[in-house]
Amino acid sequence: MDFWLWLLYFLPVSGALRVLPEVQLNVEWGGSIIIECPLPQLHVRMYLCRQMAKPGICSTVVSNTFVKKEYERRVTLTPCLDKKLFLVEMTQLTENDDGIYACGVGMKTDKGKTQKITLNVHNEYPEPFWEDEWTSERPRWLHRFLQHQMPWLHGSEHPSSSGVIAKVTTPAPKTEAPPVHQPSSITSVTQHPRVYRAFSVSATKSPALLPATTASKTSTQQAIRPLEASYSHHTRLHEQRTRHHGPHYGREDRGLHIPIPEFHILIPTFLGFLLLVLLGLVVKRAIQRRRASSRRAGRLAMRRRGRGASRPFPTQRRDASQRPRSQNNVYSACPRRARGPDSLGPAEAPLLNAPASASPASPQVLEAPWPHTPSLKMSCEYVSLGYQPAVNLEDPDSDDYINIPDPSHLPSYAPGPRSSCP
């Protein structure tokens, strides 16, 4: 009798110590989740409760006939008797929904628990812990190569033989994603808010659940593909820019497409070069002007020295101004020939016969008198004067004759015949 009493005493303790299958879920803020709870018995009360701060107390969130006020219009419970499970859907999750949940059957929440769920709600969603392969867009040839050469990558798509299987999808982005063209072999899926699923089955689970799991994962990959494709596209562009432009290309990512320090150095360098060129031109022009002025001054000095050396003495100028001109004028149209000594008078003959060795201190030119012969008719345009006019002092070398076109202005000469010009 005592044995049975002890057995009944320890029976609740053994039930409480039973380990429940646990599922951990990470959900983005504002997302939704579907929890699949096993249903060991039919036609009983089904519930989802939340573990409170005090141990052993689990507050009912939703049941067959009850919904907590905080979760109204956000939590629904749907039984699936043919699959021996029931679904609990939670939407519009916030950070206040973090915590530990449990689903079970029975009238009391502290008994009949069948599954434990740990829910984490945060703003940024990390990598899915169950995803083993990268789901970004890949070329078809690479996809076929991975399927043939690495079949172990797709092993995670099949349900495991353990008692608990968790299914999580990425959350819905805040903006509407652009449509993505899928191959014709894949059925198009209407976009819905991201759904997170968690369910637990026993090892003897019927194979009828496998197609549903595969279809769910396919729809999950199609739903998250636009977001990850966009991320992979930006990552690839960044790697290409870094590879092509080297480590110093970071300034272009910040919008500085021109190397500013080098550009600032080039501006004063260019301006300084222009100033040097202009200064060189000015100096060259000044040097040329100075050389031209020095050459001009040298020419003027040489001309003055030449004129001073060729100027005669004043006595010679006075004698030269008083000496008469000869009749053999090169500008005269009527030259005269000198007469012989026999035609001269007795007073002039000794002068002509004088020795040549006598010093001509004062040279004089004798003019022969006009012969007493009849005048010859000659055509003359000009008649030269017998005396040289006064010459300016500024031009001592001037020995030119001044011709007067009219013979009426001629001075009176010694008696003798004159040339007649018509």
Curated annotation (Swiss-Prot):
Residues 1-16 form the signal peptide. GO terms for molecular function: high-affinity IgM receptor activity; IgM binding; polymeric immunoglobulin binding. SUPFAM superfamilies: Immunoglobulin. It is a single-pass membrane protein. GO terms for biological process: Fc receptor-mediated immune complex endocytosis; humoral immune response mediated by circulating immunoglobulin; immunoglobulin transcytosis in epithelial cells; negative regulation of extrinsic apoptotic signaling pathway; negative regulation of lymphocyte apoptotic process; regulation of B cell receptor signaling pathway. High-affinity Fc receptor for immunoglobulin M (IgM), both secreted and membrane-bound IgM. Primarily regulates IgM transport and homeostasis. In lymphoid cells, enables exocytosis of membrane-bound IgM on the plasma membrane as well as endocytosis of IgM-antigen complexes toward lysosomes for degradation. In mucosal epithelium, mediates retrotranscytosis of antigen-IgM complexes across mucosal M cells toward antigen-presenting cells in mucosal lymphoid tissues. This is Immunoglobulin mu Fc receptor. It comes from Mus musculus. The gene is Fcmr.
